Amino acid sequence: MLEGIIRESIGKKGTKALRRDGYLIANIYGKGLQNLHAAFKENEYIRTVRNKETLSFPIKVDSKEMNVVVQAYEAHPVTGKLLHVDLMVAQPNVVTHYHVPVVTEGDAIGLKNKGLIHISKPRLRVKATIENTPNSIVVDVTKMDVGDAKMVRDIAKIANVTFTDADRVSVLSVIKAK
């Protein structure tokens, strides 16, 4: 379980001091809940997020335990180092928006014809309860050749889950390698 601290000072000076000490700044919020200004050790946070098996993961801040989902993050434009993360509390039986990762399944025909799979939308926005939200959206690419694309409307519907991205948005395509 990822453990964090409550930030006493939310100003620029306090934020810089926490970052210098190796902390990642986080805001934790949820429907009907008080916002929490927290900080986590950056290395522990990255290890937890990379190794999680579900969309939500447990955290402990100020003796409060909760399951959260990463809603947004901010990275430094040059170094790519994480600066800030927004975590939403995954409340049971509350319908809200989540960003679910897209995973490909199979080998595309186009890969044998000197093509590459280009995932233009690595996460799809869905509206559902946390219990009904899948951990990932699997897209079968076995019949895709160079020039083919899968759009949101081509993805199989999931029970009690609504895709909020437009139907005409391209999720992935097989492009010709240069």
Curated annotation (Swiss-Prot):
CDD domains registered for this protein in UniProt: Ribosomal_L25_TL5_CTC (cd00495)
Q: Is Ribonucleoprotein one of the keywords?
A: yes
Could you provide one GO biological process annotation from this protein's UniProt record? translation
- Which GO molecular function terms does the record list? 5S rRNA binding; structural constituent of ribosome
Classification via InterPro entries: Rbsml_bL25/Gln-tRNA_synth_N (IPR020056), Ribosomal_bL25/Gln-tRNA_synth (IPR011035), Ribosomal_bL25_b-dom (IPR020057), Ribosomal_bL25_C (IPR037121), Ribosomal_bL25_long (IPR001021), Ribosomal_L25_dom (IPR029751), Ribosomal_uL5_bac-type (IPR020930)
Question: Which key words are in the record?
Answer: Ribonucleoprotein, Ribosomal protein, RNA-binding, rRNA-binding
Query: GO CC terms for this protein?
Result: cytosolic large ribosomal subunit
Relate the protein's function as given in its record: This is one of the proteins that binds to the 5S RNA in the ribosome where it forms part of the central protuberance.
What family does this chain come from, according to its entry? Belongs to the bacterial ribosomal protein bL25 family. CTC subfamily.
Could you describe the subunit structure of this protein?
A: Part of the 50S ribosomal subunit; part of the 5S rRNA/L5/L18/L25 subcomplex. Contacts the 5S rRNA. Binds to the 5S rRNA independently of L5 and L18.
What is the protein's given name? Large ribosomal subunit protein bL25
Gene assigned in the entry: rplY
